[in-house]
Amino acid sequence: MGVGSSLRMQLTAQKPRVDRFVVPRYSLPEIHRRMTWSDRCEKYNGEIWSSKYLQQKRYINFLDEAFGLAPLKAQQRNSDTFDDWCWPCAPRKKSYLSTADNVLDLPSYSITSFPDVLDWSHDDILVAALGKKYHKWSWRTQSPVDQGQTMFDIRCCKFDPKGKRLLLGTDMRVEVHNELSKCQFVQYCKCNIQICTITAIDWSPTGNSFVTGCSRGRICAMNEKDFPIKSLVLIEGAMLVVKISPNARYVAVAGVHKHRVWILSWPDLIRFRFMKTNEIVKDLNWHPWQTALLGVATLSSDRHASMIIWEPHATDKLRQQDVGRGRYSIDAMRFNNKTGELLLSLWSLDVNVPYPKSSELVVMSNFDTVVDHWGESHTGLNRIRTMVFSPDGTKLATATADEDLIIWNFLPNDYKKILARKKFTAFPQFLDICSYGYTIR
């Protein structure tokens, strides 16, 4: 090859086109590159659990992975100091939520003032309390196994952590029944001569003591060895829910149509902290994996639902998020003990919905991610007032306003043998075991 040919190659070769007025593509920031295609996508302003929204979100995640772009963080609101903070969770990879073709009848449940008359023991026994009677139904044998009776109407019921004893809240008193459905312990509320009703109950994680809340706003810490450990009038009106934390250190309390959540020390019932919201508290639940991580469901005055995640021992660690863009009420919220996922029962408050019965079950892994859902394009499911998980977390029992007890498949069955059951151990639990709930911290 001569000098002339090499010169011609140099003259014909194209130089890289560099324009000092146009920034090369590789130097553009990531957010700018993302906006070139994300702005062209039609924004969906519907519910975050709808199939259209989930399909669009999967498509955006696919584009992020294809172009090697990091997902954008949500816009931080002024009220959200912990915008990236969320509850611990091991979310599912695909949808499992479906009905298990088990529907039982709950007569007179629709007129029950307090809905928590359903529970599931560690022996796979479902109990439903109706009036003065309660009925036990075995999931293993798919048949009723026993029934019991109380002197007064039952307002709430709860199995102890081992599933051997059943705690029943009735008018003026609580009863503890054994495995044979026989009453072995009775304790009256400390409202003296005033007539009240036990509206909320919960066992401590060790099963040595329990807490009760009544219609006059009194909360009592009790055990089966002696009279109530401590009694306290906390609010005016009926108690909605009382929940003892997994480490047996706190008890969370909320009243009916109240705007406050109280955190008391357990079992001495000393006021520790409280959270005041501008919304009505509908339900609350402790996360099973944390020592004290509380989820709170609320309903605003304009009938918009929201949820709050709060660590009571960390005063400033709190995050609130609206649920849905429509008018929904959260009737119940539960954390799954196997995956840590949050399950919400939503009821549409819009009178203009095309279907008269519009209820949603939404499974969330964080504040803006729905991993499973039931309710879209389905009709006929009335308001779900309460729900409870099976001991292994794979099944779900719900009680509706149509007086139906429905069993759901929540997770696939785990057929592997669990050689050692994991337990949450802490010093407060040790003290609670040794002292039968008398420990004063």
From Swiss-Prot:
One of its GO terms (biological process) is anaphase-promoting complex-dependent catabolic process. One of its GO terms (cellular component) is anaphase-promoting complex. SUPFAM superfamilies: WD40 repeat-like. A motif (D-box) lies at residues 379-390. Signal peptide: none annotated. WD repeats lie at residues 110-148, 149-187, 193-233, 235-276, 277-320, 345-379, 380-420. The keyword Nucleotide-binding does not apply. It comes from the Eukaryota. Keywords: Cytoplasm, Repeat, WD repeat. It is found in: Cytoplasm. Its main location: cytoplasm. InterPro entries: Cdc20/Fizzy, WD40/YVTN_repeat-like_dom_sf, WD40_repeat_dom_sf, WD40_rpt. GO terms for molecular function: anaphase-promoting complex binding; ubiquitin ligase activator activity. Belongs to the WD repeat CORT family. Controls wing pigmentation patterning, possibly by regulating scale cell development. Probably acts as an activator of the anaphase promoting complex/cyclosome (APC/C) that promotes the ubiquitin ligase activity and substrate specificity of the APC/C. This is Protein cortex. It comes from Biston betularia (Pepper-and-salt geometer moth). The gene is cort.
